[in-house]
């Protein structure tokens, strides 16, 4: 059932990561289901966040609050956007701690009557420094929104109030046949993502090419310890042209919810070898569509096992991986669930 009014998606974005990838697919998915969508950015950044260009390419309306409402303070801009809107939104869906907190403050200002307020929790790790306090405020004020969405049971367990578990999702994609034996890491080069684990595995398999797609504060350290078979490709804003060159994806994180990179890979039939993190054991049926392992050594053993398989054996696993996404983690499956949740 369609919603009778606009949906606003609210976030703060300066780079492109898991939240941005999710918001892009959410906006595109809702639009494909004939919903009116505006993605509201809290603040402007230089250079412009990559998500903005991708939304424009998809003909999705965007608005930047600090550009439109220049005379309001940060905490009052969403209130002004609501009160001045020609057509008020029926749903505002926030992503990330800044957007979540702003949405709840706006509710306390008594301007959200008849608007369904929804917040999503994406992060599986516990942040450090000042962000740790914002994260705590985000979680303990979550009751001020009508619906709360988590992408993993572990994230759910950190909330002091009830929430809905809704899978991350990606559009269906064509099966790719890799042109080589390339092993990939896709993500931010930070402690929680475990790129150092990826490099240590690569160092033990010098005959196999390993590729890192991403950037972050650990890059200088990683370049010092890597072997010659590891190539750094830097931050990527669009992996579509990259996936056909990837044979298998390793997820070496220390914390995860349900990473978008895993879904994007499997939607193309690229199997994953991962530690048992977040919802990945629900996504991966070990030995059928990928592998869940307990240690670095098991990850190496799985890689060698994969390389020893025949072409037909590999294709069977690739097809199973792709079908898992189509049946449980695709836009066509999850967007109707999201729309139903908006209307509860």
Question: Model-found features: residue ranges?
Answer:
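Conserved acidic donor-binding segment of nucleotide-sugar-dependent glycosyltransferases
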Residues: 286-297, 305-311
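A conserved mid-protein helix/loop that constitutes part of the nucleotide-sugar donor-binding site
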Residues: 17-28, 185-204, 212-220, 263
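N-terminal strand-loop element at the rim of the active site
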Residues: 8-74, 216-218
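Short hydrophobic beta-strand element within catalytic cores of glycosyltransferases
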Residues: 41, 271-274, 284
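Aromatic "clamp/platform" in nucleotide-sugar-dependent glycosyltransferases that forms part
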Residues: 235, 254
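A short, well-ordered alpha-helix in the C-terminal region of glycosyltransferases
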Residues: 313-328, 334-339
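Carbohydrate-associated surface elements
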Residues: 154, 169
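Short His-centered aromatic/hydrophobic patch
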Residues: 94-102, 121
């Amino acid at each position: 059932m369609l919603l009778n009014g606009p949906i606003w998606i609210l976030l703060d974005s300066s780079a492109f990561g898991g939240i941005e990838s999710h918001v892009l697919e959410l906006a595109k998915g809702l639009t494909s289901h004939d919903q009116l969508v505006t993605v509201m950015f809290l603040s402007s950044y230089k250079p412009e966040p990559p998500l903005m260009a991708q939304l424009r390419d998809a003909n999705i309306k965007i608005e930047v609050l600090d550009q439109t409402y220049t005379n309001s303070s940060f905490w009052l801009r969403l209130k002004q956007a609501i009160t001045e809107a020609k057509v008020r939104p029926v749903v505002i869906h926030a992503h990330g701690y800044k957007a979540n907190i702003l949405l709840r403050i706006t509710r306390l200002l008594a301007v959200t009557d008849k608007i369904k307020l929804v917040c999503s929790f994406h992060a599986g790790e516990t942040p450090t420094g000042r962000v740790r306090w914002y994260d705590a405020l985000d979680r303990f004020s979550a009751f001020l929104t009508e619906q709360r969405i988590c992408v993993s049971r572990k994230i759910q367990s950190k909330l002091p109030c009830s929430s809905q578990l809704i899978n991350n999702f990606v559009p269906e994609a064509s099966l790719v046949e890799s042109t080589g034996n390339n092993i990939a890491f896709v993500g931010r080069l930070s402690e929680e993502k475990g790129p150092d684990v990826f490099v240590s595995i690569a160092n033990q398999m010098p005959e196999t090419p390993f590729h890192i797609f991403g950037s972050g504060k650990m890059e200088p350290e990683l370049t010092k310890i890597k072997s010659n078979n590891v190539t750094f490709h830097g931050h990527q804003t669009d992996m579509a042209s990259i996936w056909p060159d990837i044979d298998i994806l390793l997820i070496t994180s220390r914390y995860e919810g349900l990473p978008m990179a895993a879904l994007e890979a499997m939607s193309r039939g690229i199997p994953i070898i991962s530690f048992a993190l977040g919802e990945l054991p629900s996504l991966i049926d070990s030995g059928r569509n990928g592998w869940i392992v307990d240690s670095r050594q098991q990850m190496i053993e799985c890689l060698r096992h994969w390389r020893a398989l025949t072409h037909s054996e590999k294709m069977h696993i690739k097809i199973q991986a792709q079908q898992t996404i189509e049946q449980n983690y695709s836009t066509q499956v999850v967007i109707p669930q999201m729309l139903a949740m908006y209307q509860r």
